[in-house]
Regions:
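Substrate-binding pocket helix/loop in short-chain dehydrogenase/reductase
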Residues: 95-105, 188, 195, 199
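Conserved glycine-rich Rossmann-like NAD(P)H-binding loop of the short-chain dehydrogenase/reductase
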Residues: 28-42
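Alpha-helical segment proximal to the catalytic Tyr-Lys
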Residues: 124-125, 166-170, 227
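Conserved glycine-rich cofactor-binding loop
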Residues: 12-13
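Short, small/polar-rich loop/turn modules that mediate ligand/substrate recognition or access, typified
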Residues: 169, 174, 229-231, 237
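Residue(s) in the substrate-gating loop at a strand-loop-helix junction
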Residues: 137
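Active-site helix of classical SDR
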Residues: 119, 153, 161
Length: 243
């Protein structure tokens, strides 16, 4: 029997890499994209293949319409896409009061327009009951003085995804949004030990989240046990932010 296919953007590291491994273990063949570095993505692919599952990494800059267009005609598309995880993103820390229009345009192009572009490119290849997860952020709801452009892009992503959920629900497709809090990814890589401790103390569960925490939630959102959930923003943050 042919295994279902999961497409994960930004699948070479962090939440994307953990999700690729989890969905492969769940029974999916995984097509993941990367942009700046092939090595981490290939390591994820190798790990998945060593377990006897199948995966493939392809270079796609989601802000580049040409590269996104090529993704839309990738040979794996002929199999149909059962799961789409829009996980790619960029976060440059810029004080809200100092944010330039160029900062905003650049971040929106990657985080929001890039996600919509990927959706448009693969839309015709989605299976009738496809499940889509957009990886947003708690900052898309609460905002941030250190990342207004990022917060705005994630707010736009979430609102678009909720609109999409209403549009494609009658077709049998589901769309949900994962909104992580603090997660141990590249975004927090420059934390000093003091800053890390400060973050942990802010979280009621007293720890920073892991990429695997997020991957487990995505696995649930694309699985049968969430079959009546669509258009939801799922906050996974250890109690840090309670909207």
């Amino acid at each position: 029997m042919t295994r279902p296919v999961a497409l994960i953007t930004g699948g070479g590291r962090g939440i994307g890499a953990a999700t690729a491994k989890r969905l492969a273990a769940d029974g999916y063949d995984v097509l993941l994209t990367y942009n700046t570095s092939s090595k981490p993505a290939e390591m994820v692919v190798d790990e998945i293949r060593e377990r006897g599952d199948d995966a493939l990494a392809v270079k796609v800059d989601c802000a580049n319409t040409g590269e996104v267009g090529l993704l839309g005609i990738h040979p794996w598309m002929a199999r149909g896409i059962d799961v789409l995880v829009l996980n790619h993103g960029a976060y440059d820390r810029v004080a809200a009061s100092d944010m330039s229009m160029e900062d905003l345009r650049r971040t929106m192009l990657v985080n929001f327009e890039g996600a919509v572009a990927v959706w448009k490119a693969v839309q015709v290849h989605l299976t009738p009951h496809a499940r889509i997860v957009a990886v947003g952020s708690q900052l898309g709801t609460r905002g941030s003085p250190h990342g207004a452009d990022y917060s705005a892009s994630k707010a736009a992503l979430a609102t678009w995804a909720r609109s999409l959920a209403q549009a494609v629900g009658p077709e049998g497709k589901r769309v949900n949004i994962l909104a992580p809090g603090f997660v141990d990814t590249d975004i927090l890589a420059k934390d000093t030990p003091e800053k890390r401790k400060e973050r942990e103390l802010q979280v009621p569960l007293k720890r920073v989240g892991t990429p695997e925490d997020m991957a487990h939630t995505i696995s649930f959102l694309v699985g049968n046990n969430s079959s009546y959930i669509t258009g939801a923003i799922i906050h996974v943050n250890g109690g840090l932010y309670l909207p």
